[in-house]
Curated annotation (Swiss-Prot):
Keywords: Aminoacyl-tRNA synthetase, ATP-binding, Cytoplasm, Ligase, Metal-binding, Nucleotide-binding, Protein biosynthesis, RNA-binding, tRNA-binding, Zinc. Pfam families: Anticodon_3, tRNA-synt_1g, tRNA_bind. Belongs to the class-I aminoacyl-tRNA synthetase family. MetG type 1 subfamily. It catalyses: tRNA(Met) + L-methionine + ATP = L-methionyl-tRNA(Met) + AMP + diphosphate. NCBIfam families: metG (TIGR00398), PRK00133.1 (NF001100). ATP binds at residue 341. This is Methionine--tRNA ligase.
Length: 689
């Protein structure tokens, strides 16, 4: 691993978090995989040798529980879903170099080697712990076989993770008020011998690693409290029939915890790729063992702890190389509300395709709607608006009018004229901005820069009006325009892989745009090409209305089913809220204007010692960074707040709470202190009207 900018001389391995084979894929899943794919393609554009891998997470309690319910074996169910996922990824042009699964022999053998190395290096020990047990079912209750209350934040939690609250990993025996998911009865805690990875051995290492690690701010900031607060050792075994048997002594009736073998699949998938192409072409060991490579993990933000605490320790304990970067994507909301599979407030991958839209349109939307770490809001109206204005009007309109005019008047690219200095400078600047954005792990800006180049082209052709010029005067204008189209095709390829191949062919280029690098943006286009076709169709308002009505109908159907007692409990239920009555006294517009509401960005968040509910926030409001006290300590994961855009009352009188001065107020809704955020990315300091 180096600290040089991309592209480096060493190869890169980009990974995506492994999906559990427990249900169909929706756009919340696709956001991570599309982002990982687009980033991999973009690195290749820079000339960075890149391998892109992932796989299906076959083991653990989620698949075991579903297999029992379906009356099939977990392997059969897992393999069926694995094939479905592979097909879906292919449909959306998520092109893994290897997409394996954790039950393959390569991963099983590597996992055994990892555990053996930990034992050889004295990082593993056995101890008695409290484990949940269901006396009625006569069964141990690992992970998702038990639910209860998170001991850290008090939210409802699964046995191994506080998925609804603070997102912490939970060790066996930690969950309070345990309930068996098998019988619904209260569980008991019994002592049981289990194996632990001694994370405390890696305390000093992790403190250094988290400072070296690149990636998104949430991935870099969230683990600091866990690491700096002292690490608890990691239970690596479970009482379960499904999984990889513990390979060492004293673990005959135990399997490895799913979060042991799951990330090792990154290594296994890379090794499988290396074996397929030959080690002379790509040597997996030089990257993963020798450190001669750039390892980049693209994950959902709910598994940050696993990838910034557990996984680096696992690698270090087996003498493997560390990751260079962890990029954690935010969630996807639907119409401004949390995606909920049980309420069917979701857009499923198959449902999107059935609606007749090209996969590239959703790829572009998900990869460029916000920065990596921020939540994306999906609505059919916003989807249509972005397709129509950014793709159809900006990219498609420019490409079509430029290539059509060039074809009809010059049979292709005008010859005997050179690219003008101004346009060459504009393209070169776009290339530099694109490269800078990727080195900041900023896909959104990279995509925006490509679309901005198309907008520049539209303005350029409109300003120069080649249709009003004679052939000699029009030639340099169209030479510039065709070059701009080529540059746009190259830069947008990571986001629109199929559509840009079509555009590349319309340009008369040989080969594929996927093989082009950023340097090709300034290489002369072919002298001849045919008449183009339009790349994008606009989405009409009537179609948006149809889609909105269909979404509302399926949500209503799921709600009715739930009311009848047939649906699942919803983790994001929002029914039955008792609203506060509206204020009886009106205020004047002048009174409202007295409030100075500003967009702010949380820079730092920490609990106030001695206060149950109060947190100290450092909030950037554009003009300055303000210290603000907010009653959100128990209601939000403070480590995840940096980078969040909030609305601040900037002209509140200063006050002092628990000895801490507060210079403003952060607006939040309801008893859960739901922080008010901006729909788009308004800059800190923007006035809220």
């Amino acid at each position: 691993m180096t600290d040089e900018d991309y592209p480096t001389d060493d190869p890169a391995v980009v990974t995506c978090g492994l999906p559990y084979p427990t249900g169909d894929l929706h756009i919340g899943h696709l956001r991570t995989y599309v982002s990982g794919d687009a980033f991999s393609r973009a690195l290749r554009k820079l000339g960075q040798e890149t391998v892109f891998v992932s796989g299906t997470d076959m083991h653990g309690t989620p698949i075991a529980v579903q297999a029992i319910e379906a009356g099939v074996g977990p392997l059969d169910l897992g393999l069926e879903r694995h094939e479905q996922y592979a097909d879906t990824f292919e449909e959306f042009s998520v092109a893994f170099d290897t997409y394996g699964h954790t039950d393959e022999e390569t991963n099983v053998e590597l996992t055994r080697e990892f555990v053996g190395a930990w034992e050889d290096n004295d990082h593993v020990y056995e101890t008695e712990i409290q484990v949940a047990y269901d006396p009625d079912a006569d069964q141990w209750l690992p992970d998702r076989y038990v639910e209860g209350t998170c001991p850290y934040c008090g939210e409802h939690a699964r046995g191994d993770e506080c998925d609804e609250g603070c997102q912490r990993h939970l060790e066996p025996g930690e969950i309070e008020a345990p309930v068996s998911t098998i019988t619904g009865n209260s569980a008991e805690y019994h002592e049981r011998a289990h194996k632990f990875l001694r994370l405390s051995d890696f305390q000093e290492y992790l403190e250094g690693f988290i400072n070296r690690m690149e990636g998104t701010n949430n991935a870099k900031n969230q683990p600091r409290e866990w690491i700096e607060g002292g690490l608890e050792d990691f239970c690596i075994t479970r009482d379960l029939d499904w999984g990889i048997d513990y390979p060492g002594e004293g673990g005959d009736d135990l399997v490895l915890y799913v979060w042991v073998d799951a990330p090792i699949e990154y290594v296994a998938a890379t090794k499988q790729y290396s074996e397929r192409v030959g080690t002379e072409e790509f040597d997996w060991a030089s990257v993963w063992k020798d450190g001669d490579g750039e390892i980049i993990h693209v994950i959902g933000r709910d598994i940050i702890q696993h990838h910034t605490v557990f996984w680096p320790s696992m690698l270090a304990g087996a003498d493997y190389a560390e990751p260079r970067a962890v990029c954690a994507t935010g969630f996807v909301n639907i119409d401004g509300r949390g995606l909920s599979t049980s309420k069917n407030r979701a857009i499923w991958a198959a449902e999107y395709l059935d609606a007749g839209f090209h996969p590239d349109l959703l790829r572009y939307y998900l990869a460029t709607a916000s920065g990596f770490e921020r939540d994306v809001n999906f609505s059919w109206a916003e989807f249509a608006q972005r397709v129509n204005t950014e793709l159809a009007d900006a990219v498609g309109n420019f490409a079509y009018r430029a290539l059509l005019f060039a074809n009809r008047n010059f049979d292709g690219t005008p010859q005997e004229v050179s690219l003008t200095d101004d346009v060459e400078t504009e393209i070169a600047q776009a290339m530099d901005d694109y490269e800078d954005a990727l080195n900041e792990y900023d896909l959104r800006t990279a995509g925006e820069r490509a679309v901005a180049l198309a907008r520049f082209g539209n303005e350029y052709i409109q300003h120069n009006e080649p249709w009003n010029l004679d052939s000699e005067a029009a030639a340099p204008v169209m030479r510039d325009c065709v070059q701009l189209v080529k540059a746009v095709a190259v830069l947008l390829q990571p986001f629109l892989p199929e559509k840009t191949e079509t555009l590349w062919a319309q340009l008369g280029e040989d080969g594929r745009v996927s093989d082009a690098t950023i340097a090709d943006c300034l290489q002369a286009p072919p002298a001849e090409f045919g008449e183009p076709a339009e790349l994008f169709e606009k989405i009409e308002d009537d179609r948006v209305t149809e889609l909105d009505e269909a979404l509302a109908a399926k949500i209503e159907a799921a709600s009715s089913e739930d009311a009848d007692g047939e649906g699942m409990a919803d983790e994001t239920a929002d029914d039955g809220i008792e609203l506060e009555p509206l204020a009886e006294d009106d205020i004047s517009f002048e009174e409202f204007q007295a409030l100075d509401l500003r967009v702010g960005e949380v820079v730092e968040a920490e609990g106030i010692e001695g206060a149950d509910d109060l947190a100290r926030l450092e909030v950037d409001i554009g003009h300055e960074v303000r210290q603000i006290v907010a009653g959100i300590k128990q209601l939000h994961d403070l480590d995840a707040l940096p980078g969040t855009r909030v609305v601040v009352v900037a002209n509140m009188e200063p006050s002092e709470l628990f000895g801490v001065e507060s210079n403003g107020m952060v607006l939040a809704a309801g008893e859960d202190a739901d922080l008010l955020t901006t729909h788009e990315d308004s800059e800190p300091g923007t006035k809220v009207m």
